[in-house]
Amino acid sequence: MNYYLAIDLKSFYASVECVERHLDPLDINLVVADTSRSSKTICLAVTPALKSFGIGGRPRLFMVEEQVAKMNQQRQKLAPNHRFANHSVSLKELTKNIYLKLDYMVVPPRMQLYIDYSARIYQIYLKYVAPEDIHVYSIDEVFMDVTPYLHQYQDNPHILAETIVKDIVQTTGITATVGIGTNLYLAKVAMDILAKKAPADEHGVRIAFLDEERYQQQLWHHQPLTDFWRIGHGISQRLAKLGLYTMADIAKCALAKDDQALNAKRLFKEFGIQAELLIDHAFGIETCTMAAIKNYQAKNHSISSSQVLFRAYEIGETYLIMKEMVDKLSAQLVKEQLVTTHLSLSLRYQAMGKEIQMPKGAKGTIALPCATQSSQQLVRAASQLFSQIIQPNVYIRRVSVQFHEVFPKSQEQAAQQLSLFVNDSLEAYEDGQTEKLAREERLTTALLDVCLRYGDNAVLKASSLLDYSTARMRNDQIGGHKK
């Protein structure tokens, strides 16, 4: 029998911030959020201590403020003369003394720091499991196939899981939640649903196990369905319209005879190929293995960039934002020695009220004359596409740029499928462009070297100094958040 681990670093960003301040992540009330984006900003992480006061994992900052104020109203009623003796961010102190005002820390995100911690923790994983048996699912979550290693741990995956997590705690101060399963799906569900509610040990470690039999016993009637991996609110609502509210309902539907109104055929009619996955998961079955994940190769590759603007931008202002994004992505192509053949744009407009009827946005794709990494060629194509799709008299709140059909520059010649009718013109075009493109590539490479040494804002275009430009700000960000 195979065994898999799903490991989730508990409240990762918040835990890192606590550790950096020599604080206990399980005791301190702390939120990671960028307060410069107003109280509507989404909190990237909340410590377990603060969650214990009824605050969710990814609330908006104003929701934290409201819940804390609500809790303090209740606590104040119990205090002598309805006055707090003091305040505290410590769960232990707040539990011990109900006359203390509930307080919490709000700290800005530091994405590069979290990446560094994640890399350190990955090195801990490698002490126990080979890289070919690890799949990095996100910055704070991994899957492992631990089957080949269990002979060293009394054939007990729980012992191995406990050993790994205790090493992480001792090395970094960060704890984790672990799901153990006989397939990848069961490991993930054991972690997401069972382990997070299981009693913790002295290090805050929670571990849960599922096989197909236990899954059907413990989770077949669990609600809501959105707690299960790969079932979002949209799928859950569509299942509810069919009268399916639990995994047991889906399994029963899959086993129904053809003459019944609700059967497997009805599921496939509603969900297409997705129904196969729903039915498998209803029975706790997952056919995907770690080897299949490692051997998977996407037919098409792409790179993209997207940003939500902090206010409604005019068309001219948005045009600059779009060019900056294309420049940044083209520099990534040069850095990684890649080329692209297609470019797409997506714009989301600012809503103007119910009384004004207008489209939600615009999008389009343009094919390039040839595979390229040239910023000039890509900006020219993007500008042409922008002019084609933009509506007059609109304001824009979101811009997305994507390069499609991305492949190594070394394969560029092999990728060109030339016909008898375009060979001559393309050859003439290439003769006039080769040296120009080579100069541009050398310049871009030199600029990348300067930015690597002195920072991304070491060299900027003059347009990036305009007050509505976002280039400087985004150069100080990773994934849309401060480095």
Model-identified regions with their sequence ranges:
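C-terminal hydrophobic structural anchor segments
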Residues: 384, 388-449
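DNA-contacting surface of Y-family translesion DNA polymerases
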Residues: 6, 227, 235-395
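Short, glycine-/Ser/Thr-/acidic-enriched flexible segments
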Residues: 10, 37, 350-352, 406-408
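Short conserved micro-motifs at the rims of enzyme active sites and ligand-binding pockets
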Residues: 355-358, 411-415, 472
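Gly/Gly-Pro- and Ser/Thr-rich, intrinsically disordered tail segments characteristic of DNA damage-repair
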Residues: 1-283, 290, 426-483
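Short aromatic/hydrophobic contact patches that present stacked aromatics
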Residues: 143, 367, 400
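A glycine-rich phosphate-binding loop feature that marks nucleotide/adenosyl-phosphate handling sites
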Residues: 182-185, 280-283, 339-350, 395-407, ...
